[in-house]
Amino acid sequence: HKITHFGGAPIILNMLANTPKEEQIKLNHKVYVLTAAAPPPSIIFKKMKELGFEVMHVYGLTETYGHILQCAWNSAWDELNEDEKADISSRQGVRYPNTEDVKVMNPENMKTVPNDGKTIGEIMIRGNVVMKGYFKDKDATKKSMKDGWFHSGDLAVMHPNGYIQIKDRSKDIIISGGENISSIEIENT
């Protein structure tokens, strides 16, 4: 059908990327893909590119009316090797223009975490794309809307180039032997 664009969750991309070779159809044109709904492993980007797909990862929530971050390609990355390109592509990205502000902040003191790619904080969003509250649930609204920010519950780091990368959902962190272990890191190994 000569499609040029489609959207699919990482699980769909994984199914396409791991289709047996004898069932794969060779594309003679590039297909652009938007993926969201979960943090995709970097290997998916590499495999999809080999099949002729150009994948962009975006991030958003129901509470933010669509995506608020996009992993927009930076031409400085053109010189990187394919593994490095795939790793960068798996990040959630930078603020989408329709969103007033997105930061990775320490929820305890509401300070922005350093752009070091290591310090974990919570993704917080504000702007006219953020919901006003949960329908008939004042407690949930009060818990998620504090200090003028929507608290996403997603734990992330901010890289030196300003790109945000999710490490886990706060409720999915595994604590073992006093260490915080990311369920996403386990899934990606």
Segments and roles (model prediction):
Residues 8, 40, 125-126, 136:
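A conserved hydrophobic position in a structured secondary element of the catalytic/binding core
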Residues 1, 10-12, 19, 181-189:
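ATP-dependent adenylate-forming carboxylate-activation enzymes
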